[in-house]
Amino acid sequence: HYVAARLHRVPASLPFFLPLPFLSPFGTLGAVIRMRGTIRDRAALLDVGASGPLAGLCVAIPLYLYGVAHSKVISTDGIEGVELGDSLLLKLMDHVAAPHYGAGQTILLSPIAYAAWGGLFVTMINLLPLSQLDGGHVAYALFGDGHNRRAPTLHRLLLAFFAVNLSASLVRDALHGVLLANVGNNVGRTLFWFVWFEMLGILGGFARGRRAEQREDDDPDGDNEDEDDRPVELSPRVRAAATLGIVLYSSFARESHSALVWLPWFGALGLLLALEARSGLLQPHDLLAHPPTDAASKPLGATRKVVAIVTLAFFVLLFLPTPMAL
C-alpha cells in the first residue's frame, strides 16, 4: 500500500500496527496506513487498494502450501482447540498439499500453515467490498459511484448471512431435541459476520465524525444542515458498546444450557437490531460511501479492470462462512 501510494504521489503514512491481543487468536488485525487528501483517479485508487492484498497472497499461498504439507494428522478423540474454517481456496490447497486422513482424524496445522491461514483470514476481511477497506477501494475503482449505491445492500447481506446461519443451526438442533445443549456453540460459530456488520457501521460512524470535524475546522462559518439532517442517528459509541456486550456475554455463557441465561442475550440482540431498524444501519445511510476521486468519471483501462475483477474474485475464494468460534 505504502509503495503504491508513494508511486502515485498520494500523501500516506507508514503502516500502523493494529494489535488485538484478546479478540484475535493472532494478536493482531494487521496494519493500516493513513492517506490524506483525495486520490487522483480510479486507476491510482485501484493500485493502492489492490497492491496490499495481492502482495500478501503472493506470500501467504505458498507458505500455506508448504506449511500444510508439513502438518500432522492427529486423532480427534478428546481433542480441544479452535477448529479453523475452510474457504474454497483453502479446500483446493488442502486437496493439493495436505496429508490424507481418515474418519476420526484431523490435521494439526504447523506453525507456518497457521500463520499463513491467519494471513489469508485477514486478507479476506480486508477484501470485503465495502467502505474504505481494500475491497472497497477496488470495488469503487471498478464501479465508481454505482458501488456506493449498492454498498448498504452488500453490507446487509452480512447480517442476513448471520441470521440464516444461526436460525438454521437452532432449528436443526431443536428438531433433534438438543437446542439448549448446543446454543452456545451455535452462537459462537455464527457470530463473526454479525460482529463485522456492526464493526463496519462503527468504523463508518467514526470516520464520518472525523470528516465533519475537518470540514468545521476548514469552514467554521459553513452551513451544517446536511450534518444536522443525517438519517443515521445511532451513535458509533453506543453501537460499539452494545456489540462488545453481546460478544462478551456469549463468550461467558457459552457452556450454559439454561434458557434463563440465553434469553437475555437474544433479547439484547433483538434490541440492538430494533435500534438499527429504527435509526441505524437498516435505514438508508451513507456510512459506507467511498470518497470520490478527483477524476471520478475517468474509467479504468482494460488491464486494470482485469486486476480489479481478479482481486474481488479472491474475496469469493477466501470467504469463510464460519471462520472460527468467537
Question: For each of these PLM feature ranges, what is it?
Answer:
Residues H1-L326:
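Hydrophobic transmembrane alpha-helices and their immediate loop junctions
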